[in-house]
Amino acid sequence: TKVLFAALLLSATTAFAQQEKLGSGIDKANMDLTIKPGNDFYRYAAGNWMKNNPLDAEHTDNGAFTDLFEQNQKRIQDIILEYASKPQQKGSLEQKIGSLYNLRMDSVRLNKEGWAPIKPTLDRIAAIKDRREYQLVTAQLDFRGEGTMMFGIGVDADLRDAANNIVQVGQGGIGLGVRDYYVNDDAQTKKIREAYKAYMKKLFQMVGNDEATAQKKMEAVMAIETRIAKASYSQVQLRDIDKNYHKMTYNQLVIDYPGIDWGNVFLASGFPAFKEICVGQPEPIHEVEKVLAETSLDDLKTYAEIKVIAGATSVLSDDFRAVAFELSKVMSGVQQDRPRWKRAVGTVSGVLGEAIGKIYVEKYFPESSKKRMLDLVHNLQTALAQRIDEA
């Protein structure tokens, strides 16, 4: 038996040796071997690739995922152009896709309209008479995607019961997105903060305010956002599930946070009746209560105004887009804006994403690819389950 086993082992080894040897998945030409891996492993592993594939003026990164993204942008444009290049049945999904794309590409019309498309919304904000109406109107506008509320609301998986969804409230309301931009004092952060102030002031001027008024409005918004930011959680704190999970009944929410008109907020936001809610970060929500109570109504309306204006910069005339891109250059380092067709594709994908996705899958994602991905996910789940069981 031992002799037979040895013979089989030798035979298998010989057969294996006769097979074509697989090459290494590591291409040393991409490495920078002059760098010590202990000092900068990333440059050690990919330094020469980075030298040979420099960033262009339009992108903040480079690599396979960037290439795939750009490939998909072109594919989506091809899909859209099928409907945008010829008349479609009125009211059909195809007509909506084509018309939206053509509108975004019509620079003559957009530049002629200027900020007229958002004037009715700004007029509605200006007409607000009291704080209760302010909360109602800003909730209605936020539901439309204007971003006018000082916190975020939505529905997501319960972090302690992933099989069920739950209504969630969390920090938000700051234009720069991250707390650090408001509280840190390093040179780069200060530069970003000043660029943001200049950006807001310019936008206020572009919708009819003189320089002094625009300056005053900018300062009012900055004061509100800084208050909220200082109370908000840092990026590190946001990683702690326990500190970001405060489940309660709706009735308890109303008791614990009385400074927010929750009934009108949820009604205006399209929520049906619900029993439970999770508050992610209590401190910034309490700070919003104080801001709503202590800030003048005019300054509150100014805050809502800038959210509407800033949110529309990508779909208004070219001068609004240019101002927004100047801020983007400071924050991201990108030196060249995306061409108009890419921005138009982005708008259509954002507004009619599910429809575009369905068409994309039918054209570019065959059943065989779906099976491969399902198998991959299944294998990943199995491997992770095994690791959890063995831990």
PLM region spans:
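A charge-rich, low-complexity, intrinsically flexible signal that marks solvent-exposed coils, linkers
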Residues: 29, 33-37
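Active-site-surrounding "flap" and adjacent substrate/cofactor-binding loops of secreted or lumenal enzymes
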Residues: 36-39, 44-109
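Short, Gly/Pro- and small/polar-rich lid/capping loops
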Residues: 19-29
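Short, intrinsically disordered, charge-balanced linker/junction segments flanking boundaries
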Residues: 13-16, 133, 384-390
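Noncatalytic, helix-rich "gating/capping" subdomain that lines the substrate-entry/channel surface
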Residues: 83-374, 379
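Zn2+-dependent metallopeptidase catalytic core
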Residues: 373-391
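Bacterial Sec-dependent N-terminal signal peptides
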Residues: 1-20
